[in-house]
Every structure is written in structure tokens, then in C-alpha cells.
Amino acid sequence: MNALKHCASIDLEDWYNDVECVVPRDSRAFSQAFDRQLNRIQSIFDEAGVRCTFFALGRTAERYPAWIKRLHAEGHEIATHGYGHARITTLDPVSFRADVRRSLEVVADLIGARPQGYRAPYFSLGRGEMWAYEILAGEGLRYSSSVFPFPGRNYGIGDHPTSPLRVATPSGTLVEMPLSVVDLAGRRLPVAGGGFWRATHRLAIRLAASRIAREGRSFVMYLHPHEFDPEPLHSHNGFARNLYVNLGRVSIADKLRYMFKRFAFVPVSSVVAGLGSIPERFIANSGGHV
């Protein structure tokens, strides 16, 4: 097993938040599905002796407080995914600060400590949202893991550094831990989780992580609870959307077990705490003061 530590993370939310589906609001069915998904995730992590970062959506934490307390008590890091799962691109600085602050308060009330980390919904911290860093720093956050350094259609920054970056703002400093990508024939390929993990063979994930490790970088992975659900998920958005949300989910648990046997995974905050000297970028006030 490589001595380099890698980042394990789960974006903790109900599945319709992730895939933007219209779904029937049967609260009992949702609770049963969430319990089923989290029990499976917990079993995999316990089996491997791995602890990870759960980026908890604020309203999800409100809905399932027992799970937040349980995961925290078992040694997992509870970070924030914002409160309402709104893209930063749809928020102004005032609304963004309110969303982040509300999520921090919800989690702090449940675990007795304020989260250290933040992940933007839909990885929506893009080139036009650099002002968000000053707000995150001002709220006391130590790191963000929000940037996908590839030119995606709806998110991503194609020329963003692929290694951790220290971001200095007038309100404080924090670290950006970008999601993992690899260069393939001159183009960046997102390999951190989601569709790539569901659609590709586990060997492809291993090769990507090994390549990143050889470059001296930690592999930053992410998954969602619904990707561990053995039961089919259905929305009102038609056949194509249902096909997408169910694609490859049956293989995710085995792929994660496979990766845990070959790489050392820890919470994101543990990797951040061990960073030495890394590049720094100053973000001047660009409208982030509220």
C-alpha cells in the first residue's frame, strides 16, 4: 500500500439533490432509502478501518440528525456541503454567506464543533465565484474541496492547479483541495468519482489513482449515498434520467473496497493538516464583503 495518504469523501445528501430530479416526496420511503444507503456505506468503511469526510448538506443534517451524530461519534469528519444545495452561480455574496452560515450552525449544534471543510454543490466554485473564498475564510473554514480542474460543461476550471493551493483573502486563508483529474492525450479527465467510477472498470480507477500518487499528489475521491443503494431509483424525469442515475451503481461498493485495499484513505482534513509548503494565491476583495 502506498504511504501517501488519499482523501475519502462522501457528499451526504438525498439522491434527488445530486441528480436534480423531480421525485415523489414520500418521506418514509426516502428515510428508508437513506438508512439503507448509509448502513451499507458504514459497513464498507468499518470493514476497511477507514474514516472519511462526509460533506453534509445542512437540510439533510436536519432531516437525519441521528446519522450525523453517529458518523461523528465513530470518527468520521463532518464537513459542510452548504445548506440548500444551491449552485454558487445562482447566489450573491449575501445569500451565499447566509447559506454557509446556516449549514455550519446546523452541524455545530449536532456535533458540538464547527466544520473545518466546505464543498460547493455541483462543484460550482468556478472562475467567476472567487469571491466565495473570502466568505468561507471569514466563516472560519480551513479548507474547501470545491474545484474540479477540468473544462466541464456546467462546472470546472480547466487551467486550475491540480495540486492543493493555499488561498489568501482579506478575511483569512484556507486551502483548496481540488478533485482529482488525470491528463490523457493533452486533455484533463475527471477521475474522482461519480460517473467515472460508475461507468469504468475498477482497474481504470486504480491506474488513475496510482498515476496521481506517482506525481506526489493525494487522490481526492467523492461518492454519494445513492450510488451505494442496491435498490433502483426512479424519478419523474423520464427514461434517460432514470438510466443515468442507476448506471453502474451495483459496482460502486466493490470498487470502493478494491481501492481501500490498495491505497491509504483518510479524511480530507487529515491530508490538509499534513500539507507542507504549497503554492499560494491571493484573492483580493471582489464583492465578497457583506
Segments predicted by a language model, with ranges:
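C-terminal domain-boundary segment and adjacent tail
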Residues: E47-A48, A199-V290
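Active-site-adjacent pocket scaffolds in enzyme catalytic domains
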Residues: D18, A113-Q116, A120-R217, M221, ...
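Active-site beta->alpha N-cap acidic-glycine motif
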Residues: M1-E74
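Metal-dependent polysaccharide deacetylase catalytic core of the NodB/CE4 family, i.e.
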Residues: A48-E129, L141, S146-R153, S171-T173, ...
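Alpha-helix N-cap and loop-to-helix initiation/capping positions
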Residues: R25-A33, L91-A98, F196-T200, A240-G248
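Short acidic/His/Gly/Ser-rich catalytic and metal-binding motifs that mark active-site loops
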Residues: D14-E20, A185-R187, P230-S235
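Generic structural signal for well-ordered alpha-helices
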Residues: L38-Q42, P65-K69, R97-E105, Y133, ...
